[in-house]
Amino acid sequence: MNPINSFIFPDIPKDLGKILMKDDQQLIVVGIIGKSSTPDCNKLVGFNLLTIHPALTDTDPRDGRVKFYFENDGKILYLHFETTFDQHVMADLLAKAVQTGIQDNFINFNSTVRTRFARVLLFAIQVCHMIVLVEPSSVFDTSYLSIFKSLKIIREKYVLKFLPKLLKSSNLGNYMGKEARLCSPRFIFFFEGTSNIKPEDVEKLDGLECSVEEEIYKMLRNEFIITNNSAMSLFSIPRSKKFVFYNSDKRAKSNPLADSIDLLMKYLNKPAGGQNDDDEDLMSRLRPYDGYGMSAWSVGKSKRAEKKERSILALLKEHVAEAFEHGFDDSASKYRGRGHFVIPSFKTWYEGFKLLHKIFIDNPSNSSYETNDPDYKAFLQNFHKIIDIDERFFAEICEHGLELAMVNYKDMLPHHYSSTFHEKKYEQAHELFTRYARGPEVERHEQKLKDYCDSIWLNGKQQCEYPSLRGNPCALGKHKVKDPTEHSSGVIFVSACNCGRTQGHREDPYTIRQGNYDFYQIIAKSCSSCNVLERVKFPVFEPSSNDFRAAEFINKNLSNLMSFEHSNRTPDASTHPPMTNENSPHLSGSQKSQDSASNLTFSMDEKRDEENKSQKFGTQGEDEDETLEQETVNEIVIKVGEHSEDKAILRQPSTTEYLPGMLHAASPAGLLPQFPSWSLVCLGPSSIYTHNSGIPEHVQSGFLSGANFLLPWDVSVRLEHAQSWAASYEKIRNRKKNTSQPKSSESSNTFTLKIFLGVEYECLRGHRFIMSGPDTVLRGGSGSIVRDSGSKVVFNDMPIYFPCPCRSSNIAQLMRVHVVTPKAPVNVIVEPKVRILQGTTQNCLTFTTGLTEPIKLSQSAYWILRLPFIYEGDSGPLMPPAGVTVANAATHGVLMAGMFGIRESEISEELL
């Protein structure tokens, strides 16, 4: 029989059971727990107690396993606990967790390791008189403090409530008393780590142990793990004996196989000679255990002389001797004598041990176990929560970060806000949350933050966000509307009225009617001129009954529209007369009415060609007050044509269906909109405008400095058939001048007209300016005369959108065309066409006024044509572009060239 016996609970051999349970044998129970770094996980190696090194056995360690060790004639029962703090047990647990995917992060895994170790440690505290905490290193692991503190809380809050009841009901463990344990167990701290102190230097080792004892005692006292009353402490610390031991014997960490091979080689290499005491000692060290290769009789009779040496086993025996003699009472003098200490027989103790093992180890490991005792149930449910300080720490910092993030999100919230603002506020709150949150609870708290922010936004804070025709979202709360006009973005623009005299605030439009008609009707009430000025009426839908609706159609003319756009023609030649470029160097145009027509064309020629009867455009410059620089003068040939026999066949507009959008070149014939998007008013006589000072501020407000001048356009008109009205015109003209000087035939047929034009742009802040060309803003100095020619705007496409020269980098839109007609027996005609490009030049719409003929303006008058604020095609409104620059302005939309023309008028003396 080996000097020391062992077995693994609960498999106790019969022969060992008889030995332990004979004569009511009493034993001091010493628990061995802590950490180990060897594959066998046996922490008794450093005690020099084992006869066979654990490395030579084939037993695999397992979490929660308890192994009993005792000597036949000894008084100590060693309980060796294998826990998750043993390195190889932890490695096996980690391998299983990775394989099964149960633990998704290290924090959860570490929490599981700590919880399982704490269960075993609490169980050891209940069944042991002494506990040796083994540490492989030379430094105390302060992470034990949190486990000790948590176990003290668990014991006081739960264990002392349910355990006495369970022991009493089972008639087992009555010897444990009210404390439900043998005693307040003494803790011995055993450090296996080698220090720099040599084993021979005992004084330094003792000094190190004393200093470590003081530090450990202070830490345990500061955390209230031990108190003056040991009965109220988790465990006790001896007051007059050592409780810290540093192992200086290197054999505790030796590898027996490697050491045996080294010793064998050393013995074989030794020179031949007689055997001595050193050889005997060498041979004994080669044996795997004491007595190996010797007879049982010699082993029993030959006992080694016990040497007085420094060992952990000697220290334990001192404490055991005190336990048998007086028991442990480590309380202060005030509480001394009140502690509970009992040494039961092994049989009695073992029955209680089995019950406590089931309560503290087996039942918590069984996930399906249920108990009727509420205190025990609370213990099972809350054990992990209390022990797991890491998860609690990370949960608390996540909660703290979550609270700060919630406050940050709620701070200065508007009454309603958009999804973009919501996401921005959430990102700010989430950024603040991530400054604090750590650990496995981050994702769960992130979802809580997301749900919280979403709930606030969706519960009465959600903004409607329905976009306006200018792209601004509705600022009202989420609401259901019957009409788009119920939306409001809260954005206010500044715009002028139809005549341009009055500026006012306008709301961001949500319908074409709001943008192109309603605003101008409202502001007209504030304007002193709009409602009294002469105006041109544009065709609109006039229902014949109350039963009318918007037309539903598929734009079959879309392909025709694309082809006609590039040839500057309209699809319907009968309703829109084409502007064609003929072989003649002069541009010719046609005037149509229901009874007669006259052809009219414009052209610029560089050479005089008698065969083609062409004339070169002359350059003249004159003004009533000052002389302008020489500029190109355009010559217009007016031909008086014959009366047309056939009248144009015009389709009558529908009186039951209206056009839902705006009129454009491809709109179905016979459909008209419900309201006009254009406006043409006569501001008054031409004398309103003086070229020396520009447009007066009281007539047109909001113009930028130097950009309030119209451009002069000098046009030379030649009569090809003077007999129609030239004779009477000259007669009246000579009479006015009181002269009878005859003129040549050529000079009597040519007239020079001065027409003042202005293409006005207006930004959303109300800034207005005239442009002198497709890419140039007019810059007229104070007191000087603008010398730019109007021909640039007449014969070029003018962009609809252009960067405003103001500081705010707004986009200005072409909103008005100013025309000051001359005092001459001709009429200026206008036929505006706006081409809006949608992405490419192959996808565009040409918007028209809907009139079947060009508009004839009266002589010697100031006319203003107001263009639409919003454009809408058959598929819906066309959003104004963003990022307009001088270089790309013409790619978004243009007012097409060829808008202006000249027609003859009846001659009367009042015109001169």
UniProtKB/Swiss-Prot annotation:
<feature type="compositionally biased region" description="Polar residues">
    <location>
        <begin position="570"/>
        <end position="602"/>
    </location>
</feature>
<protein>
    <recommendedName>
        <fullName>Nonsense-mediated mRNA decay factor SMG8</fullName>
    </recommendedName>
</protein>
<comment type="similarity">
    <text>Belongs to the SMG8 family.</text>
</comment>
<dbReference type="GO" id="GO:0000184">
    <property type="term" value="P:nuclear-transcribed mRNA catabolic process, nonsense-mediated decay"/>
</dbReference>
<dbReference type="InterPro" id="IPR019354">
    <property type="entry name" value="SMG8-like"/>
</dbReference>
<feature type="region of interest" description="Disordered">
    <location>
        <begin position="565"/>
        <end position="630"/>
    </location>
</feature>
<dbReference type="Pfam" id="PF10220">
    <property type="entry name" value="Smg8_Smg9"/>
</dbReference>
<keyword id="KW-0866">Nonsense-mediated mRNA decay</keyword>
<comment type="function">
    <text>Involved in nonsense-mediated decay (NMD) of mRNAs containing premature stop codons. Probable component of kinase complex containing SMG1 and recruited to stalled ribosomes.</text>
</comment>
<feature type="compositionally biased region" description="Basic and acidic residues">
    <location>
        <begin position="604"/>
        <end position="614"/>
    </location>
</feature>
